[in-house]
Amino acid sequence: MKSIEVDEELYRYIASQTQHIGESASDILRRLLMVPAEQQLEVVVPVRPKGIIVSKDAGNEHKLDRVKEMRTLLISDEFAVQGKAIGRFMMILSSLYRIDSDGFIEAAAIKGRTRVYFADNEEALLASGKTTKPKAIPETPYWVITNTNTDRKRQMVDQLMVKMNYNTDIIEKVCGVI
């Protein structure tokens, strides 16, 4: 086994291409370069003692960044001055969308027993109940119902974050401050 040194940007790209836990850097590169496993390329690569090794944890940096972003929100001055749960709720939703819009879109399909919680227009929320008090989530194309109690808002954020694959620790912290 040879080792090579790669810059940080290339390392992150290779790590992001991991398809399953335990996949080696050789497997990833072979797949990306479409080289069959049997074919041996004769390439001379200088050996350097401190190469970067792609591991099963390499792809987790994205998740750490998401957690860092949420923690940064929770300790921000802008968040701290929100006097009401609705303000904190809207900031959290806006941040979740900004951090991972694709994950948010997928997760926003959650519904209650009788209500739709999120929609891309006010009318869809009003159709599920005239007293839903829909509000646009800042800096997103989404609307959310707001005439729920604080516990229901926590449940909505909890369900959203679970579907977006956040870990339990950050979900509890975020829901605890609504």
UniProtKB/Swiss-Prot annotation:
Superkingdom, natural source: Bacteria
One GO CC term on file: cytoplasm
Single biological process term from Gene Ontology: negative regulation of DNA-templated DNA replication initiation
A molecular function GO annotation: DNA binding
Keywords for the protein's UniProt record, in alphabetical order: Cytoplasm, DNA replication inhibitor, DNA-binding
Places the protein is found: Cytoplasm
Region (Interaction with DNA): 113-117
Signal peptide: none
Pfam families per record: SeqA, SeqA_N
Keyword DNA-binding belongs to the record: yes
Subunit organization: Homodimer. Polymerizes to form helical filaments.
HAMAP family: SeqA
Entry similarity comment: Belongs to the SeqA family.
Function: Negative regulator of replication initiation, which contributes to regulation of DNA replication and ensures that replication initiation occurs exactly once per chromosome per cell cycle. Binds to pairs of hemimethylated GATC sequences in the oriC region, thus preventing assembly of replication proteins and re-initiation at newly replicated origins. Repression is relieved when the region becomes fully methylated.
Record's protein name: Negative modulator of initiation of replication
Organism expressing this protein natively: Photobacterium profundum (strain SS9)
Taxonomic lineage of the native organism: Bacteria, Pseudomonadati, Pseudomonadota, Gammaproteobacteria, Vibrionales
Chain's gene name: seqA
